[in-house]
Amino acid sequence: MRVADFSFELPDELIARYPTAERTASRLLSLDGNSGALADLQFTAILEKVQPGDLMVFNNTRVIPARLFGKKQSGGKLEILVERMLDDKRILAHVRCSKSPKVDNIICLDNGYEMKMCARHDALFELELQSDKTILEVLEEVGHMPLPPYIDRPDEDADKERYQTVYNQTPGAVAAPTAGLHFDDAMLAALKDKGVKTAFVTLHVGAGTFQPVRVDEILDHKMHSEWAEVSQDVVDLIALTKANGHRVIAVGTTSVRSLESAARASAAELEAFSGDTDIFIYPGYQFQVVDAMVTNFHLPESTLIMLLSAFAGFDEVKTAYQHAIAQKYRFFSYGDAMFVTKKAN
C-alpha cells in the first residue's frame, strides 16, 4: 500500500488547540469494525460500550517537561526536545539551532544549568547535564511541556495538568498517550463499579510519533523505537479475561502497540515484555491481544491511522473519518475520541 492511501483533507478549524473544559466532555464516535456502523455519542457513553468482565488497558507513562530553551556559548539560541532519558544525567535529544553543536560544546540553560554535547547519533544528540541534580529535576524546574507542533501555540500552565493522564505514574514520555486524556477519576471509578477491570502498561512515547512518514510505500518505512513494559500481572489478567470470554480493550494506540509487542516477542502464549519496540502495525496485521480500542483522531498519512485501519478495516476507517470531518469532530491530541471494535480476520 502507498502512504498516500492514508491521506485526507482536514480543515484547520477542526484541529483542537485546547482541551475541553472537562476531560469527559469530548465527543465519541463509535465504529463497529465488522459492520462499519457509526454512532455519534458523548465520551461518557463509553460506560455503555464496555461490559462487566472486560479488561481496559491504559498506558501509565508520565509526560516529562521535555522542551528546553538555551544558548550556545557563542550566544546563538537553540531549542532542545528530549527524545529519551538515558540515565540520571544523560539524554538523547533533538537540537534545533542555526548550526549544530560539536562534541564538548557547552549549552547554557535557564537558571544557570549547563549541558555538555557528548556525541551525535544520526539526528539525535547525546547531552550530559553538568549539575548535582538529576536531569528529571532540572526538566521539572526549567522544562516546558512538549506540545505537538500542530497545536501551534506556546505551552501554558494548564497544559501541565491537561496534557497528562490522571493515572500517570512512570516518567519518560515526550508526548501524551492522548486517548487516556479523556478519563477522569470519576470515570475510572464508574468503570470499576460496572465490573470492568483495569490494567496498566508503560510505553514512553517518543517525539518520533510526530515525524511524518517520508516514503511512498508503507513497507519502506522504518519505525522509530520506544521503550515499553508489559508486566506478568497484566499478562495473567489478559489470560483470565480471554478465558472468561471477555474483551481486552486498549486505551490508545500506545497500549495497543505495547500489548502486540509482547505478543510478537512471545514464543507461544503471551509473556511479559520489557524493552524497546519498533512494532509497525499496518493493514494485513493479525492482532493477537486487542479486541477493541479507544483512540483519538490521527494525522493524515501517519503510522497511527495505518494501525487503526489494520484494526477496523481500511474502507471502514476512511468512511469514519469522512463522517467525523462532516460532523466537525475535533482532531488530534486535545480532540475527540473513537471507540472501535476489531474487524474479524
UniProtKB/Swiss-Prot annotation:
BP terms from Gene Ontology: queuosine biosynthetic process; tRNA wobble guanine modification
Annotated keywords: Cytoplasm, Queuosine biosynthesis, S-adenosyl-L-methionine, Transferase
Record EC number: 2.4.99.17
Taxon lineage: Bacteria, Pseudomonadati, Pseudomonadota, Gammaproteobacteria, Alteromonadales
Record's subcellular location: Cytoplasm
This protein's name: S-adenosylmethionine:tRNA ribosyltransferase-isomerase
Domain of life (superkingdom): Bacteria
InterPro entries found in the cross-reference section: QueA (IPR003699), QueA_dom1 (IPR042118), QueA_dom2 (IPR042119), QueA_sf (IPR036100)
Family from the record: Belongs to the QueA family.
Protein's job: Transfers and isomerizes the ribose moiety from AdoMet to the 7-aminomethyl group of 7-deazaguanine (preQ1-tRNA) to give epoxyqueuosine (oQ-tRNA).
Pfam families, alphabetized: Queuosine_synth
Subunit field text: Monomer.
One GO molecular-function entry: S-adenosylmethionine:tRNA ribosyltransferase-isomerase activity
Keyword flag Lipoprotein: no
Keyword Lyase: no
Gene Ontology CC terms: cytoplasm
Catalysed reactions, as listed in the record: 7-aminomethyl-7-carbaguanosine(34) in tRNA + S-adenosyl-L-methionine = epoxyqueuosine(34) in tRNA + adenine + L-methionine + 2 H(+)
Functional pathway: tRNA modification; tRNA-queuosine biosynthesis
Gene it is expressed from: queA
Broad class of where this protein is predominantly found: cytoplasm
